[in-house]
């Protein structure tokens, strides 16, 4: 393949994920983004569970029962001259580590905020993860078709709580029943809102300039209000600066309503124009890998079981970092040193699979996995390096897991280790007992695990509460000190699914004391795969 055609393929791609608090409208915005990409002719409405019209991006059986997106699915669609990869992230009350890890596989993020509620705690957590790589953030203030908080107050809150500068690109005219549309600060034009157009792309009425008499004609008293507001906004807010945006220090802000399908295209225009094309990545060698390098490489950031209820298969999601994937090509799995031929990679539109003939940097492909691929695995054209920056995150919730039938201990352990390799949950085996402790980032992961143990491994398990506040991976440069620590702190130590030594703390105070008592031991809350 010529270098210039590889560069062209890279230049037109944008790979991003959506971060939000549950119910801020992420699934609806995903629908509308796909509608603009012409993937779904009529956006699948996210309504009551009984309507039978399930959102296009919510799939496994459990999600369809509950109306939540538990798994990270991948959607690719064309928009203007770009090819956009959208990684959907589990967004409900609780998502899992998958959500965190997905953020390490994208080049930019769209942050969706409920205009009535402002910045919520899940959003704060997810923003912390994007900070690990200074990922550029675009913001969409949603639900303008309802009454929202004062827009300037919302911007202040984002700046204050998330420590990122805001540059408004569009500005709302009214909200709720009085929502009239938005003014585009960079284009100097007003775009009017029509209700009842949520399921299709609307013909927009655009009025150029703030002094245009047509504005008074169409908006009445709101026209003068808008002029005053824009004067205030121009004086009080940051102008858009692409370099600051790319450095993760400033976020362009768009206002709209995903449900009413208004403003989503303004945001997509910004994403395609400003968000970075696929970026290279750091490795464990001196040299990183550039996206335009001709040699193929990629890494696994997620493994999903049972996308196909008829087959007990698992699919490993790979982000391509460099080179070109071609059907039937050989690639090296660096961890095992084996060369594998991949002839049946997949692309997805949430649950609809299609086989890929070729794919490029920034694309996500699915590899069939019969238990041989793990999260964090690097695949190359033959070189031996490993991509860094695909972390495990310390769980925040813990349960002891018990069997209803004690004879199935072996199947339980097998199931839990496989589920932990997929990132569905983390498993800890205390050094001094036969307990099995399961750790998760969100409560829902526990339900998912019991459900999957029952349906995929025929194991009936239940949980008991356990007195664990947090876990930290432990290591030391001094082997003797580590051995001594292992002897003295044995009651609090466990091995995780990958046999890494872990400190299980009953309270945060206990953890602080342990860190003070053992200064030569490093306690970390993320661990590289």
Swiss-Prot record:
It is found in: Cytoplasm. Increases the formation of ribosomal termination complexes and stimulates activities of RF-1 and RF-2. It binds guanine nucleotides and has strong preference for UGA stop codons. It may interact directly with the ribosome. The stimulation of RF-1 and RF-2 is significantly reduced by GTP and GDP, but not by GMP. InterPro entries: EF-G-like_DII, EFG_III/V, G_TR_CS, P-loop_NTPase, PrfC, RF3_C, RF3_dom_3_sf, RF3_GTP-bd. GO terms for molecular function: GTP binding; GTPase activity; guanosine tetraphosphate binding; translation release factor activity, codon nonspecific; translation release factor activity, codon specific. Keywords: Cytoplasm, GTP-binding, Nucleotide-binding, Protein biosynthesis. Belongs to the TRAFAC class translation factor GTPase superfamily. Classic translation factor GTPase family. PrfC subfamily. NCBIfam families: prfC, PRK00741.1, small_GTP. One of its GO terms (cellular component) is cytosol. Its main location: cytoplasm. One of its GO terms (biological process) is regulation of translational termination. Residues 11-279 form the tr-type G domain. This is Peptide chain release factor 3. GTP binds at residues 20-27, 88-92, 142-145.
